[in-house]
From Swiss-Prot:
Its EC number is 2.3.1.274. This is Phosphate acyltransferase. Catalyzes the reversible formation of acyl-phosphate (acyl-PO(4)) from acyl-[acyl-carrier-protein] (acyl-ACP). This enzyme utilizes acyl-ACP as fatty acyl donor, but not acyl-CoA. It is an enzyme of class 2 (transferase). The keyword tRNA processing does not apply. The keyword Lipid biosynthesis applies. It comes from Neorickettsia sennetsu (strain ATCC VR-367 / Miyayama). GO terms for molecular function: phosphate:acyl-[acyl carrier protein] acyltransferase activity. It catalyses: a fatty acyl-[ACP] + phosphate = an acyl phosphate + holo-[ACP]. The lineage of its organism: Bacteria, Pseudomonadati, Pseudomonadota, Alphaproteobacteria, Rickettsiales.
């Protein structure tokens, strides 16, 4: 127990995601190989399926750093929230519950986003004064990093919710990126005040009228402003944010494949590719969504990290890394201290 006590204890929903449980458990192995003796996994899912995966040579070293907790039910990708929360024997439900009971310090799931948000909200509870949780992460820009929320937890948001997201995103930027006075903007189709939905325009006025100094509200931002590094935090509803994220990821993959293909068209291009290999690898790694996997569910009273539903082992390993970093840096407590200033 003392040995486990020195490690970050991570609850894994092994049955959530398109490639569960194989890629989930392989992802845990990948992370453990890269960070030996740093974590202990509590694996929630069908025990027979988990044991089958652990019998693989690729996962053999995981055996000494995990515990299997059987969960006979699974939250499916098309389950409605009302159905998912009733599946109290599911791997997702039991993994989140493990954090509430403080047996684990964080939970990671690649499963149904809406269900994960709802179950986390019910079991972990909301932070004081917060209406809804949001999925938050950082994206690379020309000048560094930008915090983006919401990325899919709430498809439709009122102006009051968007207003709170601004404070939550600012708190995350301060805690995770060390930005002292974040520049916060609302994502919109233009920068003119008369553009946008009613909720966005109302949120604009609420943020303009605030009297605190937690952050600097700079108005609206278009996607080009976001990736150009002109803003530290960008706020949107979950539908818009998720579309922007997935579009950016698909453009990256298109350009990556095109660049790689261009270096193989002739002998000269192959030589150029060899010369530029190190620089290209560095740039591609910075923008690779698989290496940036893992978004925090901010606003709940615990560390809950959502991985992409289609995560492979490398992507899921990075989601685990994101969760471990949140715990190790005590980011949730720092975020809580900052969020408490919301009216």
């Amino acid at each position: 127990m003392d040995q486990v006590g020195r490690k970050v204890v991570v609850a894994l929903d092994t049955m959530g995601g398109d490639r569960a449980p194989d890629e989930i458990l392989l992802g845990a192995s990948v992370y453990l190989r890269q960070n030996p003796s740093s974590v202990f996994f509590r694996l929630f899912g069908n025990s027979s399926s988990i044991e089958r995966c652990l019998s693989s040579k690729a996962n053999v070293h995981l055996l000494e750093s995990c515990e299997i907790i059987h969960a006979g039910d699974v939250v499916m990708s098309d389950d409605k929230l009302s159905s998912a929360v009733r599946k109290k024997g599911s791997s997702m439900y039991k993994a989140v519950q493990d954090v509430r009971e403080k047996a684990s310090q964080c939970v990671v799931s690649a499963g149904n986003t809406g269900a994960f948000m709802g179950i986390s909200k019910i079991l972990l509870g909301m932070l004081e004064n917060i209406y809804r949780p949001a999925i938050v992460t950082t994206l690379p820009t020309k000048k560094g990093e930008v915090v983006v929320l919401d990325l899919g937890a709430n498809l439709d948001c009122s102006s009051d919710v968007l207003y709170q997201f601004a404070f939550m995103g600012s708190a995350f930027a301060k805690a995770a990126l060390g930005v002292k006075n974040p520049r916060v903007a609302l994502l919109n189709v233009g920068v003119e005040e008369n553009k946008g939905t009613d909720a966005v325009k109302e949120a604009f006025h609420l943020l303009n009228e605030r009297t605190d100094e937690d952050f600097t509200f700079i108005g609206y931002a278009e996607p080009s402003d976001v990736l150009g590094g002109e803003v530290d935090v960008v706020v949107s509803d979950g539908f818009t944010g998720n579309v922007m994220l997935k579009t950016a990821e698909s453009i990256f993959r298109l350009l990556r494949d095109d660049i790689v293909g261009a270096t193989r068209t002739s002998l000269l291009s192959r030589l150029a590719g060899l010369v530029l290999a190190k620089s290209l690898k560095k740039s591609i790694s910075r923008f690779n969504p698989d290496l940036r996997n893992g978004a925090m569910l901010i606003g709940v009273n615990g560390v809950a990290v959502k991985a992409h539903g289609g995560s492979d082992s490398v992507a899921f390993a990075n989601a685990i890394g994101a969760a471990v970093k949140l715990v190790a840096n005590n980011l949730n407590s720092k975020i809580i201290d900052s969020i408490c200033t919301i009216d």
